[in-house]
Amino acid sequence: LFDRMEHLSDYTKGYLQGIMQAQMKVYGYYFIEELLSKEIIEDMQHSLPLQPGNDSVESTEWLFAHYVIARKIANLERTALLKAVSEHFNTKLYTPNPTPELSQIHNMGSVDYQRQMPYVFKNSAINLNISLRSIRSGIPLRCFDIMGCGGFLLSNYQGDFYEHFVPGEDLVLFESQEDFLNKGDYYLKHDNERRQIA
């Protein structure tokens, strides 16, 4: 949806790029909605008419922050992290989508989630979770699937992990791209620790 907003003013484009880059540096708090002024929303609506339904409790700011901008941030962040990890490690990605921008990734196509994905989770050295930033504290279901299959999980910070799991014992959390790469490298070199956590 974000990329469909082709008629944004240069100011709005720059502003949105700036706040998205700032959000990508902060884990554990999603602040985008707070930064969307009336003028920015009006400019975005001009390019992408989006309104909450009559019986909706969400505001227009919430819709743009969570449905449009959060998804764009996730796309940018996932692409950047996958590019970085694929430059250092043999990396496979299971997706039905083509990934020409990730030339060093081995795109394995899609697999059946019920029959084949548990095998992938269990037998992958490291399974990555990069959550939508608009998921403020919750744990994505895929994380439970990975850990339930005995897979090793390296995930971005989500507050609820601390309520249900012990980081470093049940899973490993990263706080930045550098931390992500360092922990990936460490656990690939320390099989026993990785297997114990998995």
Tell where the protein language model's regions lie, with residue ranges.
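Conserved catalytic-core segment of nucleotide-activated headgroup transferases in glycan assembly
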Residues: 1-123
